[in-house]
Amino acid sequence: MGAMRDKILSVLEDYDKANIHIGTIGSHSALNILKGAKDEGFSTVCICREREKKVYESFGVADKFVIVSDYSDLLDENIQEELRHLNTILIPHGSFNAYIGKFDSLLLPMFGNRELMIWETDRDRQREWLERSGVRMPKKYSRPEEIEGLAIVKYPGAKGGKGYFIVSSPEEFYEISDEMVKKGLIGEEDIKNAEIQEYILGANIYFSFFYSPVYGRVELIAVDRRYESTADALGKVPAKEQIRANINPTYTVIGNFPVVLRESLLVQAFEAAEGIVEVSKEIAYPGMVGAFCIESIFDENALMYVFEISARIVAGTNVGIPTSPYSYILFGENMYMGRRIAREIKLAAEKDMLGELIY
C-alpha cells in the first residue's frame, strides 16, 4: 500500500495548512471528535445523512455539513473533491470499518494508519499482531468441535457486540447459532466466519491509549467498561426464571461507564500497549498513529488477558469528556480523545510533521 500512501501524501501536500478542516462521519464518536477539533481551534465538517444532521446541529460542533444519502457516498469523487477543497483531514472511527475494503477509492488524508485498520478487522491478522506483541490472550478454537468449557463466539467487523454469545459445548454452539439466525441477530455467513475464543471469567476493561509520533510516547487517555444488552439485564431476572425462559445473553453494546483502575494494574496495560505499538511498526509502516483501544479482561488473579484491539478511536472514549483522571494527570488540563487527536494535528502542523500522522 506504499503507492497509495504516496498518493494521499500528494493530496496533503496541496492543502492550505493554515485552513485545515477536521472531518468525520456523523456517528459513533463524531461529537467527541468534532468538539475536540473546535476546542483546538479547527473548523469542522460533518459528513452525515439528513436524518442525523439535527444531532450535530443541536450540539453546535459542525461548522459545515456534507449531506449524503448513504455513508458509502464518501467514496464518490464529487464528495471527496468537496472535502479536499476544504483541506479536510478525516478522523476514522468504528463506522468507517464498513468501507475498509474500499479504502483504495478514498483519496483523502486520514489521521492514523488505514492499513492497521485492515489488520484490526481481519481476525487472523489481528491475532497474529497481538501474539507477536507478547500479550497474554484467551485460547482460540479453530472450529466448534474443539470447544471445551466456556467460550465466546464473535464475528468480524465493528458490530458493537451484536449477536455475540457464550457456549460450553459444540452442541450448544449450533443450537444457539440457529436461534440467533432466526432472531435476525446474525446471518448464516456470520456462523461460518465466527471466531471462537476461550471465555475468561473476570472484569472487562477497555483501555483507550494514544500513540504520539510528535512526542514519541504512549499515553493513557481513558478507561471504560461497557453496558451490554441483554447480559447486564440478567441480574434483574431471578435464576429460576432465567432457566424457565431459556434466556441466552447477548452482548450488544448500549453504552459505556468510566473506570479508574487499581494503580498496581496499570503496568500490565502499559506493557501491552508498548508491545502493540512496536509490532505495528513492523507490520504496517509507519505503525500506530493516534488513538487505539486494548480490550481486555482481568481474571481473579488480576492477570490481564487481551482479546481484541481497535486501531482508531472507540466510543468508550466518550466517557472521558471533558477529561479523565489519567489525561488530567498527564496534561494538567481538560483533555479527551477528540481533543488529543486535534492537538496532535496542530502540533504536527507547527513542526512540519503532518505527513507522519496521515495515511
UniProtKB/Swiss-Prot annotation:
Pathway: Purine metabolism; IMP biosynthesis via de novo pathway; 5-formamido-1-(5-phospho-D-ribosyl)imidazole-4-carboxamide from 5-amino-1-(5-phospho-D-ribosyl)imidazole-4-carboxamide (formate route): step 1/1. GO terms for biological process: 'de novo' IMP biosynthetic process. Its EC number is 6.3.4.23. Keywords: ATP-binding, Ligase, Magnesium, Manganese, Metal-binding, Nucleotide-binding, Purine biosynthesis. ATP binds at residues 144-206, 228. Pfam families: DUF1246, DUF1297. This is 5-formaminoimidazole-4-carboxamide-1-(beta)-D-ribofuranosyl 5'-monophosphate synthetase. It comes from Archaeoglobus fulgidus (strain ATCC 49558 / DSM 4304 / JCM 9628 / NBRC 100126 / VC-16).
